[in-house]
Each structure stands twice: as structure tokens, then as C-alpha cells.
């Protein structure tokens, strides 16, 4: 395979362009796709742990995320910098879901938060320390994925709201408020209501 090159006329032996097979001939030799063919697709399951340190200001009903740590099982990381960026970007989205992003509808069904003035997004760097750590755990059997690659795009986003809510409930308990948060986002208004229930 190392001696083969793909060129405009097909595939030829490196250094011997006369020894060539047209791409059409290669495709014809591969057979047809019949819709009945099946293959075993083994899952490449990923997991992550999120830990957040935050503080609640009971006077202003605001949350300040101070530190955030992520340990993510990414299998074999092809490009660790890209994985790190996916985790941090996903984290920002998850913090938005947890603390500010809310779809609000009017009683007549009209979407009330249809622009960036009304629908709050994390728009600047969130002032906190983020510590992502990649854990490369290779699954023993991955079938059609022998390199052990796993997904990374969603775990930054999905786990963040749960981690934030757990930390918020813990912070509220320290303030003498025993609340179970069941609605996101935990906006300052909702946090105020929890603090003064």
C-alpha cells in the first residue's frame, strides 16, 4: 500500500505511472451495495466527571463560578488541544444552560426571548479557572474502531448543568436553605426565590 499513489488517471505504482488501474475499475471490483449487508458496530462509550467550585452572593442572588475541573475519558486523543477546546467550549454552553439561557413564551405562544437582548448567552470569557484533564482509556473491544477513539463534543455541555446544580444546592445548604433545584436556568430571580422561600 505504501508503494501506491492516487493520481488523475487512477491508482499507480509509485515511480511507475504505466502500472495503473483506473478508479472506475477499482470501484466496479468492489461489488454493489445491496441494503441487506450488516456489520457489527460496537459502541465507544465515553464518560466524564465535572467538579465545580462556586459561591453564592445571598444579597444579589448571583452565582460566581470560581473553579471548574473536568476529567474526560476520550479514548485516544487525536489532537489533545482540540479535545481541550471542545471541553472548554462545551462547558461555557453548559454554564449558559445552567445559569442564564431561558426560552420564554408569552401567554399567546409568542416567543419572547427571540433576540440576544432578551436571551442571555455567555458572551465573554467566564472569569474562572478551568482545569480539563484528558483520561485516555482504551476500550478492550471496539470492533470497527481499533484505535480507541471516543466522542468529546457533548460531555462538556451535558454534565455542566448537573455539576452546577449540585454545587448550588450544597452552597444553599451552607446558607441554611434546603432546596432541591428542578428548573433551569437558575437565574438570579429564581435564586432569590430559593433564598427567600
Q: Which positions does each model-derived feature cover?
A:
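C-terminal catalytic domains of large/alpha subunits in multi-subunit enzymes
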Residues: 1-197
